[in-house]
Amino acid sequence: MPSVTLKSENLESEGPILEVHFLIPSELEKKYIEEKKPIPEPVIIKSLIDTGASACVIQKEIPEKLGLEPMGVTKINTPSSKEHECYQYFIRMVIPSHNLIYEGAFIAAPLEGQNISCLIGRDVLKSGILIYIGYANQFTLSLL
């Protein structure tokens, strides 16, 4: 099971943050290659592992930069709003240095006033292991 272990001097205040790359889905990439279309460059962002988020959330600019169309609409609840409608996108998320890959649905919603552009939620964590060692300012994420 591929995993990534990171240390952070500010783990308590910032949380478990890691750099991830967003790419078009692998099936779409195959289609682009067959059609000799240019493949969009990866969108590289900071992401927070959030056990309080039931699903992964990304800033809406990410799928726009990749030229993706929404696959549907879903409703989310946040601490400040209820049943807020948001687009869902099928995207590939990669942590290239550790060969961690997740391909699935991401909800596009505002993540303003933060130094992150993605929340990695329990829909990803259900396929992995998260170890948070607070006293060592360290966390490990493993994904199937």
Task: Give the residues covered by each predicted segment.
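Pepsin/retropepsin-fold aspartyl endopeptidases
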Residues: 1-144
